Amino acid sequence: MVFVKLPLLKALSVPMDRGRRLSDGQRVFGANKTWKGFLGMILFCAVSAWLCWRRAFTFSFLRGAWLGFAYAIAELPNSFIKRRLNIVPGKNGGIVQTFFDQADSVIGYVLLLPIVYPLTPAEASGIFIIGTATHYIVNVLLYFMKLKKQKG
């Protein structure tokens, strides 16, 4: 989120759907899903993985990039559904939608993580619970830092 707010790589700050609307008149993903955020998450995860694992650069960097891709791509279906439900980008549509706003990317991460790291069901459940809770807590902190407009 901080990266997206910085005045860097402005050419990537365009919405992924480029303003395209479907037959229902709504945007595909909305203004908040930008190439800068999508690619930034992949790069952030790749660099973080390399810094944490300190194995061969290519191994760690590519593994992190894969997991960043999983995280970023999993946010898109939720954004698509929210547009169909006329929920404004950056807003939630009730408790169920708030849950999916926090859990969508974690679900993608847990589904694609086994490709690079085998998981037991208990590990997958733990990652899901801790990841979703962490996502919510970080969003609340971003709200108090005035980097997000709503808490959840």
Residue ranges and their predicted role:
Residues 1-49, 53-68, 72-111, 121-152:
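Interhelical loop and helix-boundary elements at the membrane-water interface
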Residues 115-116:
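Selective transmembrane helix interface/packing segments
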